[in-house]
């Protein structure tokens, strides 16, 4: 299967789309030829919407099988669309680009280290997972420096051994370093994945795909 895809010619598919085990949330104007690739590779239902009237879905949405977290600036129509699939938590104040500042799966969530304890407690209650503050190689936007599924976590190659150890302790899953699109360390910008499969931005090398498959537990094709 061809694992390479772009959104309007842009390989940063993790910025524009967000994938879960059952749905892929994409901008309304993504062509059917692209959404078909998502359906086939990831076994998902396609949900078309903007968030905050913006196409950068991946930067503004995050969550797990228990709930979705989005910017509080989402419109009523956007909230109604997403509410059909999960309960929603709205980030009303401060940093609200949820997909940038939160990394989450059904085992854990890691957040921008400047988020306060009250927020972390609320997020933990909502997603039903332990929440830790974290940087990945000194990058605070952990949601774009890594990709987490319920099978493994791909992190930036700049991630320190201590940061990897902390992730392994909180999620009890394989954690490994990887890149996309020929050396992009912000793997969350160019990779989407779930328990069934993955897609990477156009330009990702075969070696990079091999690392992704190894960490997330997919057999090489």
From Swiss-Prot:
A Gene Ontology biological process term: cytosolic ribosome assembly
Record Pfam families: eIF-6 (PF01912)
One GO MF term attached to the UniProt entry: ribosome binding
The UniProt record lists the keyword Transmembrane: no
Keywords associated with the record: Initiation factor, Protein biosynthesis
Classification via SUPFAM superfamilies: Pentein (SSF55909)
Record-linked HAMAP family: eIF_6
Role, per record: Binds to the 50S ribosomal subunit and prevents its association with the 30S ribosomal subunit to form the 70S initiation complex.
Family, similarity comment: Belongs to the eIF-6 family.
UniProt protein name: Translation initiation factor 6
Gene: eif6
């Amino acid at each position: 299967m061809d694992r390479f895809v772009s959104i309007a010619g842009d390989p940063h598919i993790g910025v524009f789309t967000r994938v879960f085990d059952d749905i892929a949330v994409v901008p309304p104007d993504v062509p059917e030829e692209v959404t078909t690739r998502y359906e086939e590779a990831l076994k998902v239902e396609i949900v078309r919407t903007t968030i905050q009237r913006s196409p950068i879905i991946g930067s503004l949405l995050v969550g797990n099988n228990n709930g979705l977290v989005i910017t509080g600036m989402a419109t009523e129509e956007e909230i109604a669309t997403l509410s059909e699939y999960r309960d929603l938590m709205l980030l009303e104040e401060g940093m609200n680009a949820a997909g940038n500042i939160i990394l989450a799966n059904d085992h854990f969530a890691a957040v921008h280290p400047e988020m306060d304890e009250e927020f972390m407690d609320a997020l933990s209650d909502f997603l039903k997972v332990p929440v830790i503050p974290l940087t990945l190689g000194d990058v605070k936007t952990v949601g774009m420096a890594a990709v987490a599924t319920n099978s493994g976590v791909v992190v930036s190659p700049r991630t320190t051994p201590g940061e990897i150890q902390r992730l392994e302790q909180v999620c009890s899953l394989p954690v490994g370093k990887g890149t996309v699109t020929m050396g992009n360390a912000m793997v969350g910008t160019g990779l989407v994945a779930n328990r069934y499969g993955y897609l990477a931005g156009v330009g990702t090398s075969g070696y990079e795909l091999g690392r992704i498959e190894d960490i997330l537990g997919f057999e090489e094709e």
